[in-house]
């Protein structure tokens, strides 16, 4: 929000707390906002930068319809802002339920070259086919557009960790390779959502193969309430003609 504040730490996982007393944003959301602002301020946002000053002419798709980043982007961007959730696998991308749009990042309904920024926080690990999601993001982004997101990320290994796969012959249609792991999910507060993958630098190679110019950002800024050693944000651009990182 960019306002003077106090950050509250309520449990040891700094990535999921360090809560702003004003806007209720958490550490991980501010990491994404910081990288978004860095891209419009030539690499380093000024101390007073806030997401409420993001350019209104940019089409931004956020894969979340709750929490502080959504609230700020919706208030700022208006009609150019798109927010969605993964609601039900039986729904088609673009369908709505209770006023919320359902979109499967692995199979979206958006037109080619139609979006400037795609942002999401800890979403990709819940998709059984993340490589399809990477291809879809590249397809719908405009040349020069970017996807900025967080995922659980290993720094001690190169390859992604496959924890579960879709298998019609398995109980529940999912075969678990490693012990089941679930994350909290505002859409499914009782059940949570299954983790299919935990990522590693291999993800950036997969994004390069899809055509992206990706970079791994390590974000740390006590001034912005971005604490801890796990401030990892992926920032990947769909290059315009002649564009480089």
Where are the language model's segments positioned?
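Conserved N-terminal segment of class I S-adenosyl-L-methionine
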Residues: 1-107, 164-168, 222-245
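S-adenosyl-L-methionine-dependent methyltransferase catalytic module, highlighting the catalytic core
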Residues: 131-244
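Residues that mark the start of a beta-strand
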Residues: 57-60, 114, 142
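Active-site micro-motifs of SAM-dependent methyltransferase domains
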Residues: 107, 125, 155
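GHKL-family ATP-binding catalytic core of two-component histidine kinases
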Residues: 109-111, 128, 200
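A short SAM/SAH-binding and catalytic strip from SAM-dependent methyltransferases
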Residues: 116-128
